[in-house]
Amino acid sequence: MRKICVFIIGILIPMMVSAQNDWANYNRYAEANAQVTEAPKAVLMGDSITDGWPFADPEFFSENNFVGRGISGQVTSQMLLRFRQDVIDLHPKYVVILAGTNDIAENSGKIDMDKTFGNIVSMCDLAKANGIKPILCSVIPATSFYWHPHVTGAAEKIVKLNAMIEKYAKENKIKYVDYHSAMKDERGGLPESLAKDGVHPTREGYDIMKSLLLKAL
């Protein structure tokens, strides 16, 4: 029995270490990336908002040769870590970056706005260095986050980060897609018709985003 227990522990410990080491969740799209045989027109990089888009509107991706590479809950530093595997190695013409919601939601601790912005800039730098055109998107509106109700001032923080992103985009001649202005309500958040939980878009919300993104491509 003792030998069996030691054997099981010997198997489980490496598995647990491997899972802990995959903080960026490289494994999420490893198989899908290996199956990409044609360079996509665009890779959409992001968090759960991007993650849910192909399920809400699969035709938008298939008809336009887009690939979704969003991972629920991720902050910008995680996206930056997996940027080579999930974007550069797929050789798209464009990368559409929608990032920052979970930084503001404090998924990895209290937000450092400059570091979050710097991670987004670094993704743009990596894209341009590899012949990929970055497209920057505003963080979509939110007034609170149901999984982290302690976070305050979400709407104002989103506006601040968006201003930084837009300024950088203009100064560097990068296209900027302003979802925020088109989707916000009088509170600076999302109306229920566009997001039942106040954060994740409904199909109607994604339709607004789709229209704006297609104009930029």
Where are these regions (language model features)?
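Alpha-helical cap/lid subdomain in secreted, periplasmic
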Residues: E59-N65, L81-L217
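Hydrophobic alpha-helical transmembrane segments of integral membrane proteins
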Residues: G10-I11
